[in-house]
Each structure stands twice: as structure tokens, then as C-alpha cells.
């Protein structure tokens, strides 16, 4: 399949890059390793508020992704989720990117908006866990309502586990929060809220325990087995298991493509966001230059910079004239 721009990464900056490309008349295909678009905003903290997005006093990460996707939708970007960009080959005037699902996309330019790299979830190290994934075992939450009046076990000791413990305690019949260490990594105020909630019997904290086994049938968990550090064991009846063990980022494929990487970031020219390979750009947290600020806001600006440079110097066709969006009514009708 052919397009104008391939965008690697469908976090907030990647989605906005698709919008910017479309606004300039460029077709975009977007590749992301996670099951749904949104990057860490969707996978790790969808219900957390972000306070530094212009025009919003506050907005949840999930709402920001929804708004960005709706904004880009008018230009019909094509999303390829649940797959990695594994190969990039340079042709005379274009690039061919191949994904882990054997999809090949040809484009005149590539924009890498991969955050800290392609992400995959750190999964439960239990051989049978894949049987339950997507049915009663989840590594992120898309629809909290499915946990209403259910018994939910949450495993993990960071912000995601703690935050979802607080949120789901309002919906679930019972929430168990499991951590392999005695001390959680969440903020002191969040942990204080968890301990207060534990007094209501809606939530129970079990530490230091690890999940040692899953029992159930047809993909539906019925029991979760825990092992303590001193050898004791506990079996919980449960309907769902949420495992928040973080994400594994990797830039390995990008290094293999010959892209110049320093300290796990891609070196770019701040004036154009271009890399050491002509036609390949990087924006968002993965891009590095002097005085770089790793903010979503900065990534939005870099997306515009890269797309305008591609439209002016690579795509060709009609004469390029910079215009403000207020003078592009024919595009937004």
C-alpha cells in the first residue's frame, strides 16, 4: 500500500502528526505496537488529569486521546495497531516500512513519534496466562463498567495499580491490590487514600505477595493463587485480574535502520525535526536536541514543524505556501 507519510507511534503526538499531515494534504498511515491508539495516555493513565494542554483547565488523558483522534478523523488516517515497524528500506525517492504482521507500506517520508520506543506490556510470567488475556486478564483498562459488581484483583505497586484500585473500588464488589513488595511506589497521598478505603472493606491490600497461578475455564478466571515471600499461600476467588507491571520500551529496530540515537533518543535538527537520514523525522519524546523539553505540548509543535518541512521539500506537487488554519476553510468544511 502507498501513502505520503508513515507515522510510527500513535500516542498523542503521533495522532496530532496525522492531523497535521492531513491538513497539508498528505495521506498518513500510523503504526503502533499497542492494541489501541493513545500510547501511555491510554495504556497507563487514562483517568489521570493533564494540566498543561492549551485551552483546557484540565483534561483526562483518555479524553485528550479521544479529542485528538476525532480531530484527525476528518483526514482518514489509517491505523495499524498491535504491530511493530520491523524493517525500513530506502528506495530512490521513497521508503518501504514492513510491520510485524507482514504489512508493507510505501511512503515518501517517515515520522517517528515513538515516545520512549515501541511498547509492549510486561506480562504475568505464568505459562497459562495467555488463555485469559483479553477476556478476564487485562494489562490496561478500556471500559471500567465491565468491573461493576465484580471481584477484581489488581497486581502492581505503581501509580497505575494504585489509581485503578481507587477508581474501581467505586464500581466493583471487592478489589484486591497485590504487590510483591511491602512498600508501594505511588504517592504518599494516594497510598493514604488506599489505606482509608481499606477500612471500608471495599478494598484489601495484600503484600508482599506474587501471583503464582491462575485457575478458570474458557478464558474466564475463577481463582488466583498467591505466594508470599516466606512460603505462605493464598487463593482468591476473582472475576478479573488487572496486571500493571509497566511497559517495555525499545528502539532496537530504529538503531538497525541506521538512525543516529543517543541515550535512547533520536538526534534531530530542531529547525526541521529531520534525522541523519533524509526523509526520516522524529517528534515527541523520542526526539532530542539541545534544551529539549519532553512535553506533549512540545511534541505538538514538532509535529507541525516536521509536516510542514515534508510538504515543502519532499512531497512536491502544488506550490507550497504557508497558510494559517483560519485561511483553510476549504479543508475544514
UniProtKB/Swiss-Prot annotation:
Cofactor(s), by name: FAD
Cofactor note: Binds 1 FAD per subunit.
InterPro entries: FAD/NAD-bd_sf, FAD/NAD-binding_dom, Fd--NADP_Rdtase_type_2, Ferredoxin-NADP_redctase_2
Catalytic activity: 2 reduced [2Fe-2S]-[ferredoxin] + NADP(+) + H(+) = 2 oxidized [2Fe-2S]-[ferredoxin] + NADPH
SUPFAM superfamilies cross-referenced by the UniProt entry: FAD/NAD(P)-binding domain (SSF51905)
Keywords linked to the UniProt accession: FAD, Flavoprotein, NADP, Oxidoreductase
Pfam families, alphabetized: Pyr_redox_2
Record: residues binding FAD: 32, 40, 45, 85, 119, 285, 326
EC number(s) from the headed UniProt entry: 1.18.1.2
GO MF, any single term: ferredoxin-NADP+ reductase activity
Domain of life: Bacteria
Oligomeric form and interacting partners: Homodimer.
PANTHER family: THIOREDOXIN REDUCTASE 1-RELATED-RELATED
Family per similarity comment: Belongs to the ferredoxin--NADP reductase type 2 family.
Name of the molecule in the record: Ferredoxin--NADP reductase
Protein species of origin: Neorickettsia sennetsu (strain ATCC VR-367 / Miyayama)
Amino acid at each position: 500500500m502507498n501513502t505520503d507519510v508513515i507515522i510510527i507511534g500513535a500516542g498523542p503526538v503521533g495522532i496530532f502528526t496525522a492531523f497535521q499531515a492531513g491538513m497539508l494534504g498528505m495521506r498518513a498511515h500510523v503504526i503502533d505496537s499497542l492494541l489501541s491508539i493513545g500510547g501511555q495516555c491510554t495504556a497507563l493513565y487514562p483517568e489521570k488529569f493533564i494540566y498543561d494542554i492549551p485551552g483546557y483547565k484540565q483534561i483526562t488523558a483518555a479524553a485528550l486521546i479521544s479529542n485528538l483522534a476525532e480531530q484527525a478523523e476528518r483526514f482518514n488516517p489509517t491505523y495499524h495497531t498491535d504491530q511493530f515497524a520491523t524493517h525500513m528500506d530506502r528506495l530512490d525517492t521513497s521508503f518501504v516500512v514492513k510491520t510485524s504482521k507482514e504489512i508493507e507500506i510505501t511512503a515518501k517520508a517517515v515520522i517517528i513519534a515513538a515516545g520512549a520506543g515501541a511498547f509492549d506490556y510486561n506480562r504475568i510470567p505464568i505459562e497459562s496466562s495467555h488463555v485469559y488475556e483479553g477476556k478476564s486478564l487485562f494489562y490496561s483498562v478500556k471500559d471500567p463498567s465491565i468491573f461493576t459488581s465484580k471481584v477484581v484483583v489488581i497486581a502492581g505497586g505503581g501509580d497505575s495499580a494504585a489509581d485503578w484500585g481507587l477508581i474501581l473500588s467505586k464500581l466493583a464488589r471487592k478489589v484486591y491490590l497485590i504487590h510483591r513488595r511491602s512498600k508501594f511506589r505511588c504517592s504518599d497521598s494516594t497510598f493514604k487514600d488506599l489505606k482509608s478505603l481499606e477500612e471500608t472493606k471495599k478494598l484489601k491490600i495484600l503484600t508482599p505477595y506474587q501471583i503464582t497461578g491462575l485457575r478458570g475455564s474458557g478464558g474466564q478466571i475463577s481463582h488466583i493463587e498467591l505466594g508470599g515471600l516466606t512460603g505462605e499461600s493464598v487463593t482468591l476467588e476473582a472475576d478479573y485480574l488487572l496486571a500493571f507491571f509497566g511497559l517495555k520500551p525499545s528502539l532496537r529496530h530504529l538503531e538497525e535502520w541506521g538512525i543516529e540515537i543517543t541515550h535512547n533518543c533520536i538526534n534531530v535538527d530542531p529547525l526541521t525535526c529531520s534525522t541523519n537520514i533524509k526523509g526520516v523525522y522524529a517528534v515527541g519524546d523520542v526526539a532530542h536536541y539541545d534544551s529539549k523539553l519532553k512535553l506533549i505540548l512540545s511534541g505538538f509543535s514538532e509535529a507541525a514543524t516536521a509536516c510542514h518541512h515534508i510538504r515543502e521539500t519532499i512531497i512536491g506537487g502544488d506550490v507550497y505556501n504557508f497558510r494559517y488554519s483560519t485561511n483553510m476553510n476549504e479543508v475544514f468544511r
